[in-house]
């Protein structure tokens, strides 16, 4: 299903998407097209993109083509999903140590829809960090890996 979503293949394209997406949540899925977990997430993203079109713009970003952002967001596990609103990086408290990105795939379409709605409402009120509406049992668990320390 990843062929249904637009792809950003360079740092310039990612920069342009961040700068030009206004009054919507920008969803950037970092990963690889052939990865099975990325394909699972892409299926959820593509099935919800039409329903969320007034609130969110969803793009796929290949980690191999954008090493600057892969390093900047410390993408050690794929897929990782990062959110922006009007050029501002939106953080979400998932009950995990990392609030900058969602790592892994969402369990259900509704989890993703709920998260986008919460980010959108919070961003419209000027918040830069919001509380995740996703049940903690549905948030993938992982250990933070600090590189080059």
From Swiss-Prot:
Stretch forming the signal peptide: none
Keywords: Cell cycle, mRNA processing, mRNA splicing, Nucleus
Main location (coarse class): nucleus
SS bond partners: none
Keyword check for Cell cycle: yes
Purpose: Essential role in pre-mRNA splicing. Required in cell cycle progression for S/G(2) transition.
Stored PANTHER family: THIOREDOXIN-LIKE PROTEIN 4B, THIOREDOXIN-LIKE PROTEN 4A, 4B
Domain of life: Eukaryota
Family: Belongs to the DIM1 family.
Record localization: Nucleus
Bilayer-spanning residue ranges: none
Assembly: Homodimer. Interacts with the U5-102 kDa protein subunit of the spliceosome.
Name by which UniProt lists this protein: Thioredoxin-like protein 4B
UniProt-listed SMART domains: DIM1
């Amino acid at each position: 299903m990843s062929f249904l979503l637009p792809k950003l293949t360079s740092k310039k394209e990612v920069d342009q998407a961040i700068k030009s997406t206004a009054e919507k949540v920008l969803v950037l899925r970092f990963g690889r097209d052939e990865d099975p977990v990325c394909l699972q997430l892409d299926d959820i993203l593509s099935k919800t993109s039409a329903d969320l079109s007034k609130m969110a713009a969803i793009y796929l970003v290949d980690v191999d083509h954008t090493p600057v952002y892969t390093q900047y967001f410390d993408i050690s596990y794929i897929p990782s999903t990062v959110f922006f609103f009007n050029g501002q990086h939106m953080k979400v408290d998932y009950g995990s140590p990392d609030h900058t990105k969602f790592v892994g795939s969402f369990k259900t379409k509704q989890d993703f829809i709920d998260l986008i709605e919460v980010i959108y409402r919070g961003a419209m009120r000027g918040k830069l960090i919001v509380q995740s509406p996703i049940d903690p049992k549905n948030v993938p668990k992982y250990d933070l890996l600090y590189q080059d320390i």
